[in-house]
Amino acid sequence: MFLGSSVIAAALDPFQLYEEYGISSYNLGVMQQPMIGTFFWMKEALKTQSPKLIVVEIKTAGRVSDKDEADSRKSYEYMRWGKNKLQYALEYTNTNEQADIFEYLFPLSIYHTRWSELSRDDYNFVLGEDKSYTRGFATLTTRYENKETYKEYNGIREDDKKQKDYNETNTKYLRRIIDLAKENNIELLFVKTPDSAWNTYKHN
């Protein structure tokens, strides 16, 4: 099982893993998934699955603060409604000043500007009925370091700053992920997937 932000969703293909190594897996990576999202997705998955190994992308663990709240909440919105989603909403809105608990508990409020345009897909998304036919894998094309010259990204970018402060909230949920894995006798593998937004400042 793979958990984390979009970089892992686009990097690890469960079909290829099965075809080449015979390993069954699922990718639960979601764009801008904060560590609190990784923790609650792990809890949600363990309701029905018993993985031997969980691979966790730690890119967001090093953030000083969450990025745009609208992007970060996608991790929440994809989850099927239930106890874990409710707890996710309560804890996330307590740690993020941009987050409105009402909009998390009643997500249709975010569609108020286009009620007449809503389709079946919108309702399936809100109700958590969307299905992934790629087992969570996001098929993306080549990423370029410079879109004007089409210079392909080739390694970690240098940065003058030596150390990046850490986010206490992310550290807290990282520890909860470790504890949850121990409770369920699951091995954890922490990885940092290569991406063009990574640099020595974040790495340190």
Identify the residue ranges that each predicted region occupies.
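Short, well-ordered beta-to-alpha junction loops that form the rim of enzyme active sites
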Residues: 59, 192-194
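Secreted/periplasmic serine-hydrolase-like ester/acetyl group-modifying domain
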Residues: 71-184
